[in-house]
A protein has these predicted regions:
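Membrane-anchoring hydrophobic helices of lipid-metabolizing enzymes
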Residues: 2-125, 130, 159-162, 167-169
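Short basic/hydrophobic patches in alpha-helices and adjacent helix-turn junctions
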Residues: 68, 223-224
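Soluble catalytic domains of membrane acyltransferases
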Residues: 92, 96-223
Length: 224
């Protein structure tokens, strides 16, 4: 069945109007943060996120999820945790332009690198703390790893992200069939692969997560 006209119009609007405009707003901000000291960039983004995010509908979702995880905490405690969450997320965004600098300054602490010095290995990460560091773990161990990534919804920003990943000394595979082939090839060659285990899924196996059946990726378990 052909896509309806409204869908095609939205795709054209996003590609030629929405995405370029959003990128034009995001790129100067990224460059501005990059010229700031990393600690100031981190703090400013933390404050900005803490100021704006609680006013959005996402804040209700965050608090709803926290009540599932911490059912015994009071509403006041949940509010405090939500504010801390938004501040930390803002800090993470503020640190993204400074990934290389933070690594060179020794601000990234890694444990267990000796376990992946040789032979095949599977790295499993999550969107906790500064998740972009996962893409550098293989390089820190002296290995050229392969990582699965989910493209940014904005095609302009996605191209910029791919360019940024060139600093990681790694191979990146877009989520899908080709990623599975690339990762399998890496492991068969005795190399390192990595993926995040908490990406939005509509497939996978259903696993109870805090009492709620949740679609869960099984790629790492299958490959191992």
């Amino acid at each position: 069945m052909a896509n309806p006209l409204s869908y095609r119009l939205k795709k054209c609007f996003d590609r030629y109007i929405h995405d370029p405009i959003a990128a034009l707003l995001a790129i100067p901000l990224f460059l501005f943060l990059k010229i700031l000291p990393y600690n100031l960039s981190s703090y400013l983004c933390g404050i900005l996120m803490l100021t704006i995010a609680p006013l959005t509908s996402y804040n209700k979702r965050v608090k709803r999820h926290m009540k599932i995880v911490f059912p015994k905490k009071s509403s006041m405690e949940i509010d405090k945790l939500a504010r801390e969450h938004w501040f930390m997320l803002g800090q993470t965004i503020g640190e993204m332009p400074h990934i290389n600098k933070l690594i060179n300054l020794g601000r990234l602490k890694t444990e267990g690198l000796e376990k992946i010095n040789k032979g095949p290995a599977i790295l499993v990460g999550a969107h906790m703390g500064n998740w972009e560091f996962l893409g550098r773990v293989g390089d820190l161990a002296g290995r050229r790893a392969g990582y699965v990534f989910r493209p940014v919804n904005n095609w302009v920003l996605n191209k910029i992200q791919i360019h940024r990943n060139k600093d990681a000394n790694a191979d990146f595979y877009r989520k899908g069939r080709l990623a599975a082939i690339g990762m399998a090839g890496k492991l068969k060659a005795g190399e390192v692969v990595g993926l995040t285990g908490d990406q939005l899924l509509r497939e996978g196996i259903m696993v109870p997560f805090f009492g709620i059946d949740t679609p869960t990726p099984q790629a790492a378990a299958i490959m191992s």
